[in-house]
Amino acid sequence: MSVRLRMRQALPAAMRARDKAAVSALRAALAALDNAEAVPVDEAELRGLALEQSPVGVGVTEAARRELSERGVVDVVRAEAAVRLDVAAQLTAPAHADRATQLRAEAAVLLRFLDGPGTA
């Protein structure tokens, strides 16, 4: 089973369990995966169209998407975990201890998905 699918399946369970770290990490990682699949839009094609020339119909507003390989998914999730660990390491002031702990917990959630079956 793919990393993305396991993450999508884990999100509702984390929400039911009220696991804030898991919910936050999974939502952010899934959004990062969606963003990584986005294809740049050529705004020159859309700019300056009169209302009558605007695209109309089912699916015309859908954006093209790239297909990430499983390796690409793993790389994005690993990068999301690394960002959290880097930020947590920078939060050294006692006032930020709770936030650093939260970020480390989120990184641990993401790294668990990379250690499971079907990661590469």
Q: Which residues fall in each region the model found?
A:
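Charged, compositionally biased, marginally structured helical/coil segments
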Residues: M1-A120
